[in-house]
Amino acid sequence: MPTLEWIGKSKVISHHQDVPFRVLERKYSFDENGQHSEDNGSENMIIRGDNLEALKALLPRYEGRVKCIYIDPPYNTGNEGWVYNDNVNDPKIKKWLGAVVGKEGEDLTRHDKWLCMMYPRLKLLQKLLADDGAIFISIDDAEFFNLRSICNEVFGEQNFIATVIWRKNYAPKSTAKHFSEDHDYILVFGKNADMWTPHKMPRTEKQNKAYKNPDNDPRGLWRPNNLAARNYYSKGTYSITCPSGRVINGPPSGSYWRVSEEKFHELDKDGRIWWGKDGNNVPAPKIFLTEVSDGIVPQTLWSYEEVGHTQDAKKEIKSIFSGEMPFDTPKPYRLIERILQIASDSDSIILDSFAGSGTTAHAVLNMNKADGGHRKF
């Protein structure tokens, strides 16, 4: 497997092992209304401090137990105006690089610094992840290639699951120099991809609209399927006579009927073939809504109509912070909710080590309230 090399890699490749264990000290807790209260024994945690040390501190209790990890790390676009300092020139990062990387750190490019920062954190996140768990990482084009490369190395190329494309803008940016960048990526890796199974997404009203019942079939709504397929089938070549008398000599060139002639006649006898209103169409097997799965397999293209856009996220943050905007690139609540719907169970442990405005925690609490679950963050 090809690996990515950068200045400082040799110094950080095993740095996660050198990070000291810190004891997490419980300072205070909040009740369900967000008010400060006495310790209520909640297992949810918001940890304040260096996330590298925080991740190491979680290992004794949570190694191999976290079902779903979502992180939104710095995109490394050169923006210095936010809490994580997007071009990785934060004084704390500089100090850390000097201590860990040494003099080489003085010659690091922006990308070198970002990789040095991310690598040990990903190593610890991999240890925390459950065998049947998955990590979702938001990123854009600036570091997508580098992130995919080091994730291949940390999690194993065989554990790559998907690259989700989130369309984050609902209108083009007229100030764009070349193209209006309307999407971000969400990179998905499993601890063991063969053991990870996503939850299916609820069927939407739009998807269900494809099911109709033009012949008033007592079995209810259905949609037509294509009888022909390109996969070779030894029994998939035969002529068909329509109710109108039209003869179809066989499937289209380069394709085969999906079922044998015997099976086709069984389906037709059971009223599961649609010939069109005049009985002259190429036959189409019916797929009944009552017989399909309750949900659909998650897709890799997420539209802003489904999961929100950047303006939604900013409105949500302003409503929390009395009109202030302390975070430049928040993620909408519905985006995080979609990830948790796919990747968590009702009693899962969920981790976000670049927590920002706390949208992940918000989503966990709301989902628990909605379905009576016991997810923890």
Region locations from a protein language model:
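Conserved Class I SAM-dependent methyltransferase catalytic core
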Residues: K103-E104, L108-T163
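Class I S-adenosyl-L-methionine
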Residues: I161-V188
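Conserved proline-anchored active-site loop of SAM-dependent methyltransferases
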Residues: G64-W82, C151, I350-V364
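Conserved S-adenosyl-L-methionine
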Residues: L4-W6, I13-S14, P91-K92, L115, ...
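Active-site-adjacent helix-turn-beta-strand microarchitecture at beta-sheet edges
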Residues: K191-K318, S322
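Phosphate/ATP-binding catalytic cores across multiple sugar-kinase/actin-like superfamilies
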Residues: A54, L58, M117-L122, L128-L129, ...
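Glycine-rich adenosyl-nucleotide cofactor-binding module
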Residues: H36-P60, Q311-I349, N366
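DnaQ-like (DEDDh/DEDDy) 3′-5′ exonuclease domain used for proofreading
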Residues: M1-Y70, Y75-P120
